């Protein structure tokens, strides 16, 4: 954790996926899942420092890692000396500006969990907004199991890796992203109004039925 960036570094120094940029302090959206351990550490030790780090990371991630529509960037690279954001990119998604499905799932679960642990309204808002992005996306299949990236193969999204649509008979799905999101929604529905909660619950059940079929 760095007080200058306000978040936890995910990897040591490395080159970006396309090899064009240097990542000095890369932070991935996946880190939202790991904050639960820090909240637990504060509970069992009585030391609030761990939870404070988790809160700082979640707040910084909400500010720097999300787009206006509440989709997120997989990787944000910071300058470790100044805390300034240098790059917003991907390492596993279709393109830098696309919505990698598992990354969206990490966010929904992560902010739902952060709200459970803190009851901070801004975390509940993030959980709902990221959930709404997922549930309302025009490219979410009827069975609720997403394509591996919501924007894979779409116009305006250019991958900087050797992608050839002919290699795939159809766009692959991401069952793990579906399971993560279903788990998050089964908790999130308890924290919102009854009407919204019912929609989240039904979406989770539909997702699980698809995964189990």
Please place each PLM-identified region on the residue numbering.
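Glycan-recognition and catalytic cores of secretory/periplasmic carbohydrate-active enzymes
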Residues: 1-213
